[in-house]
């Protein structure tokens, strides 16, 4: 068997990626989230496949087909709630994975980091089009508001919106194409994830100390396979608790009402994992400015390798930047809270302050703290 996995053309790839892969001996549990994201992706594809067998992407039957899945299909309610809450678990793992990358300076592996940003954007697109499919009130109005943002594009905005809608409003054509996108995008994510792994294994993994670990590596199996299995078990346990005991806690009550173009909900908001970006969008009074800020809130991640001037790798020995990093995390939580609040005082003011702080920390404070710490080392 050992000879086979080392010489077989296909098994050799698996062997070099998951069995004999030289891995730093000191990587902590924060490195588990990559494998957890892979598990989340598999769960989402499998549950989504079974949901797609019973779902109909027609405006007249979409809402009732989801109700039919929950009521009449064997374990349909479980599949539906695993899929809906699986998306939340996916984004929790994703945010922690990106946060770990920033904290431990993994962004210096620029190819892996940039593919990761593409993966992040693709996952957000998949979640957005998926949220439209149940065709509830928040699905419909969320789709209307977010797609309508494209009308801010100069000259071609209105044409672009109608082209995406497939008509003059969010309707049957929009739902059908969003279902098609939601079906194909996870497979594109899978392809990008493999490229992400390919680039990671070219350079080798980063580690908590930020030092070169070539002299101290161990095989991935059995050490990290066992460690990953523990993480997977905890993830599945959290997902099952969420899906079985609190299935609707992260959803919106408005989505229990079928979509009605004549009745606007009091407060339109996306799923919780988009609220930080939504708060940044709303904090700018100008429509085009808001859209640009929304896009930049994610694309600014690409600036980390460019703005990094530190002589040390990661934040483990850098107390000044550590304080700024945790302020950044707290600020993100504030943005998430504000995104779910109505557009009125004092929430608008808090949102504007938090949005300015978000960009200031990344563009100004972190590079300045890098310079300060570099000078402290020289003393």
From Swiss-Prot:
Keywords tagged on the record: Electron transport, Heme, Iron, Membrane, Metal-binding, Mitochondrion, Mitochondrion inner membrane, Respiratory chain, Transmembrane, Transmembrane helix, Transport, Ubiquinone
Chain ranges passing through the membrane: 33-53, 77-98, 113-133, 178-198, 226-246, 288-308, 320-340, 347-367
Listed SUPFAM superfamilies: a domain/subunit of cytochrome bc1 complex (Ubiquinol-cytochrome c reductase), Transmembrane di-heme cytochromes
Superkingdom of this protein's organism: Eukaryota
Gene3D superfamilies referenced in this protein's UniProt entry, alphabetically: Cytochrome Bc1 Complex, Chain C
Record membrane topology: Multi-pass membrane protein
Residues bound to heme b b566: 97, 196
Main location: mitochondrion
Record family assignment: Belongs to the cytochrome b family.
Role, per record: Component of the ubiquinol-cytochrome c reductase complex (complex III or cytochrome b-c1 complex) that is part of the mitochondrial respiratory chain. The b-c1 complex mediates electron transfer from ubiquinol to cytochrome c. Contributes to the generation of a proton gradient across the mitochondrial membrane that is then used for ATP synthesis.
Subunit structure: The cytochrome bc1 complex contains 11 subunits: 3 respiratory subunits (MT-CYB, CYC1 and UQCRFS1), 2 core proteins (UQCRC1 and UQCRC2) and 6 low-molecular weight proteins (UQCRH/QCR6, UQCRB/QCR7, UQCRQ/QCR8, UQCR10/QCR9, UQCR11/QCR10 and a cleavage product of UQCRFS1). This cytochrome bc1 complex then forms a dimer.
Listed name of the protein: Cytochrome b
Annotated source species: Akodon budini
């Amino acid at each position: 068997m050992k000879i086979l996995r080392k010489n077989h053309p296909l098994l050799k790839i698996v062997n070099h990626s998951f069995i004999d892969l030289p891995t730093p001996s000191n990587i902590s549990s924060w490195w588990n989230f990559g494998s957890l994201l892979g598990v989340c992706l598999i769960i989402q594809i499998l549950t989504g496949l079974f949901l797609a067998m019973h779902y109909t992407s027609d405006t007249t039957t979409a809402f009732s087909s989801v109700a039919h899945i929950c009521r009449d299909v064997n374990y349909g309610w479980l599949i539906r709630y695993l899929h809906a809450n699986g998306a939340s678990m996916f984004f929790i793992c994703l945010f922690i994975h990106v946060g770990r990358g920033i904290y431990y300076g993994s962004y210096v592996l620029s190819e892996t980091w940039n593919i990761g940003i593409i993966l992040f954007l693709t996952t957000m697109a998949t979640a957005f089009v998926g949220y439209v499919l149940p065709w509830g009130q928040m699905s419909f109005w969320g789709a209307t508001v977010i797609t309508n943002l494209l009308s801010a594009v100069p000259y071609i905005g209105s044409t672009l919106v109608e082209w995406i809608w497939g008509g003059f409003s969010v309707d049957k054509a929009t739902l059908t194409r969003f279902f098609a996108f939601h079906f194909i995008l996870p497979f594109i994510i899978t392809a990008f994830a493999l490229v992400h792994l390919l680039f990671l294994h070219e350079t080798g993994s980063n580690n908590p100390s930020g030092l070169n670990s070539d002299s101290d590596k161990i095989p991935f199996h059995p050490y990290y396979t066992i460690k990953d299995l523990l993480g997977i078990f905890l993830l599945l346990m959290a997902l099952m608790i969420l899906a079985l005991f609190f299935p609707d806690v992260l959803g919106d009550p408005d989505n229990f009402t079928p979509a009605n173009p004549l009745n606007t909900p009091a407060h339109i908001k996306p799923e919780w994992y988009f609220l930080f970006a939504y708060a940044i969008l709303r904090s700018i009074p100008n429509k085009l400015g808001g859209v640009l800020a929304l896009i930049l809130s994610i694309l600014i991640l690409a600036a980390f390798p460019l703005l990094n001037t530190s002589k040390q790798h990661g934040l483990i020995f850098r107390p000044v930047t550590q304080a700024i990093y945790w302020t950044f995390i707290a600020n993100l939580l504030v943005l998430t809270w504000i995104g779910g609040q109505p557009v009125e005082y004092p929430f608008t003011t808090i949102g504007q302050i938090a949005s300015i702080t978000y960009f200031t920390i990344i563009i100004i404070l972190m590079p300045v703290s890098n310079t300060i710490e570099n000078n402290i080392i020289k003393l």
